Amino acid sequence: MANLADGKLELLTDRNSVLVLVDYQSAMFKSVASGDKTIIKHAAIFAAKAASILGVPVVLSSINPKSLGEFIPEITRLFPGQEVFARTMPSFDAFEDERTWNAVRKTGRKKLVISGLWTSMCFAYTALHGLKEGLEAYGLIDAAGDSTPDAHKYGVERMLQAGVIPITLESLVSEWMHDWGNPKAGELVKEVYSKYGAMIGLQ
């Protein structure tokens, strides 16, 4: 019988989640070879867009932007004036950067929705750190990529074995929206579902 006190049985909402996106930078994308770069990139963009529509707090982290490029503007422009935390400690784990971790902690949200580049490194290590801190981690898998298909596959498997819950863009947005009575439903359909659906061939 399911433990009804288990937070994992509670759906993601715009009130219990924080979205963390790690290292969506130009040089990182160049090395992605585990899937369609355009779809991976836009899954992250549309997750950020949905968060901006629904008011879900978002934390952005980058590594060595002078060499690897700035965080992609398609996401940063959704959050004007918000700082991208360029890690002062060049760690693969974004939460080893105190400012990044404090930004997440201060939201008070227990459900960590996270994705990043690359899957097996910065995404995985940060997600595992979130678990160690007592958060429930939800890995946005279709917004992640790695240098090879195997690197992505086994990075995902490592996270799942540790307790990260896999999720896709469409399931994430649907959970956040909850039902068609949501006053933001029309905007989500126009700005997220329809555009992403057309990109992946649903329309």
PLM feature segments, named:
Residues 22, 46-47, 130-132:
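Short, flexible segments with low predicted structural confidence
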Residues 2-18, 54, 66-203:
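Active-site-adjacent betaalpha module
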Residues 21-22, 57-63:
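Short beta-strand segments at enzyme active-site cores
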Residues 32-35, 63, 151:
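Short, solvent-exposed loop/turn segments at secondary-structure boundaries
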Residues 17, 22-25:
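Catalytic-site beta-strand/loop segments enriched in glycine and acidic/polar residues
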Residues 15-17, 33-59:
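A short alpha/beta connector and helix-capping loop motif
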